[in-house]
A protein has these predicted regions:
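Glycine-rich phosphate-binding loop signature in dinucleotide/nucleotide-binding domains
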Residues: 1
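N-terminal Rossmann-like NAD(P) cofactor-binding module of classical short-chain dehydrogenase/reductase
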Residues: 4-7
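Short beta->alpha linker loops
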Residues: 9-10, 93-97
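Glycine-rich phosphate-binding loop and adjacent beta-alpha segment
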Residues: 13-85, 117-120
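A broad detector of short, well-ordered amphipathic alpha-helices
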Residues: 16, 96-99
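A structural signal for short, well-ordered beta-strand elements
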Residues: 39, 91-94
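C-terminal capping/lid region of NAD(P)-dependent oxidoreductase domains
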Residues: 77, 84-91, 99-120
Length: 120
């Protein structure tokens, strides 16, 4: 057995590993290439595992299907309000420490979202 759905924003070696551990009839969602290496797809694994590899480009999806995009965002916000999902927040910074927030992101000291708070 393996993973039914894999969300891959990294690419490179992570993509290669994902293809090896995906379940029969699984779905691999290609989100980005943070590793800096765009992986090459070995189509024999797609055949043997009966899986699908799907590119997910939010900007183009939002442009082509704005109604569905709005509905998806509303559904997500409803789940947040109902407590069904909770975004992982790694760090909080006041606006005055925006440069420190960027340094934390660039040095990969964060594991979730970074929030910058603006005072009214």
């Amino acid at each position: 057995k393996g993973a039914d759905v894999i969300y891959d924003p990294v690419g490179g070696d992570a993509f290669d590993q994902s293809m090896r551990c995906i379940n029969w009839n699984g779905r691999l969602l290609v989100i980005g290439f943070a590793s800096g290496r765009i992986a090459e797809l070995k189509t024999n694994l797609v055949l043997l595992k009966g899986c699908s590899v799907v590119g997910v480009f939010w900007g183009e999806f939002a442009r082509r299907t704005p109604e569905k995009n709005r509905a998806n965002f509303q559904a997500m916000l409803d789940m947040v309000e109902e407590g069904k999902i909770k975004p992982h927040v790694s760090m909080h910074f006041p606006l005055e420490q925006g440069a420190e927030a960027m340094k934390a992101l660039l040095s990969r000291k964060t594991t979730g979202k970074v929030i910058i708070t603006v005072k009214e």
